[in-house]
């Protein structure tokens, strides 16, 4: 299976969520983005997403203090898995991969919306999930967000992208 994000950017797939900061439809069942505004969660629910995973810290820029309640009120499951942007750990990636494995089915029964502040942290975690759990090639696992992030990526995140299964598993 190939990441459809690059096809999305070529205009082959349209999205009702393009108004959300840095939205990328990674696979038919997984979309990623930066922090949505409160009113955008209704659009996420209307697009068929049943799970929202937030990797941002509770005190991140534009964080919504009531995000979990808002998501639940729209009939979606909310999972907050905060990852410190300054010090992501292999255990964070391992937990994320485990969570995604439990939620992401080949049948596409549930759609998963994963976000952080600007979709950088999520793109890196999705890269590892797609490579290690789904068998994507390095190229196919890369989100188009990497091109946008490259000029700003620090050594912490550049190093994280080189982690192997052994690094993540401990």
What is each stretch, according to the model?
Residues 120-124:
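Glycine-rich nucleophile elbow surrounding the catalytic serine of serine-hydrolase chemistry
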Residues 31-108:
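Cysteine-based protein phosphatase catalytic domain of the PTP/DSP
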Residues 3-47, 53-54, 162-164:
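Cys-based phosphatase fold recognition centered on the PTP superfamily
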Residues 23, 49, 78, 96, ...:
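Aromatic side chains
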Residues 2-3, 86, 95-111, 117, ...:
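PTP/DSP superfamily signal
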Residues 34, 115-116:
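Active-site-adjacent beta-strand anchor residues
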Residues 15, 36-39, 88, 136-137, ...:
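Short coil/turn linker and secondary-structure boundary residues
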């Amino acid at each position: 299976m190939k990441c459809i994000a690059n096809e999305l950017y070529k205009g082959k797939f349209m999205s009702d969520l393009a108004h959300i900061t840095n939205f990328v439809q990674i696979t038919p069942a997984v979309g990623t983005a930066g922090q949505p505004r409160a009113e955008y969660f209704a659009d996420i629910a209307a697009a068929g997403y049943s799970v929202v995973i937030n990797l941002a810290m509770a005190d991140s820029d534009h964080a919504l203090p009531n995000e979990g309640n808002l998501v639940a009120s729209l009939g979606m499951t909310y999972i907050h898995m905060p990852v410190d942007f300054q010090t992501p750990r292999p255990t964070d990636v391992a937990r994320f991969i485990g969570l995604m494995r439990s939620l992401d089915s080949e049948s596409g029964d549930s759609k998963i919306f994963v976000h952080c502040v600007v979709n950088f942290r999520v793109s890196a975690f999705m890269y590892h999930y797609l490579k290690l759990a789904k068998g994507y090639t390095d190229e196919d696992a890369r989100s188009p967000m990497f091109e946008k992030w490259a000029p700003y990526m620090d050594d912490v995140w550049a190093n994280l992208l080189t982690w192997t299964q052994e690094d993540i598993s401990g």
